[in-house]
């Protein structure tokens, strides 16, 4: 499976939070989300749990930016109903059985989508190569690159900005 030009992506809620938590800053993670939103050839996938997470975090970090970004992502997102067999296949890789993480992984397994998440709970399923997952930092490096020296200084880890 290659990620050089993804066609299907699932953007975990922690990536969304990284993009919106400080609306005064334009983070690299924000740039990554905008990149995916602008690409007509990339389908953004979600599931019912992820939709609820996005809406909840847009309320926790209220700002026009958070509301607009949540709306843009959710308007573009194709909501996937996850089959039980994919949930069962993913469950053993999650200690403690975090249902949201299991559902996100199962969504990716069922559809072949690339998962972008900063959650370390996905490391076991990633290492087993059941799904393909990148951290936000890896995705930023791959698709949007670091900021130029003329832009806000910082690392390409989703926390940079002014």
What kind of region is each of these model predictions?
Residues 18-20, 57, 125, 142-143:
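Residues that scaffold the ATP/ADP-binding catalytic core of kinase and kinase-like folds
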Residues 1-46, 62:
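Short, well-structured N-terminal submotif of metal-dependent ribonuclease cores
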Residues 78-114, 120:
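Active-site neighborhoods of divalent-metal-dependent phosphate/nucleic-acid chemistry enzymes
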Residues 15-16, 50, 104, 121-122:
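Alpha-helix capping/helix-boundary segments
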Residues 110, 114-116, 120-162:
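Acidic, PIN/NYN-like endoribonuclease modules and their adjacent C-terminal/linker elements
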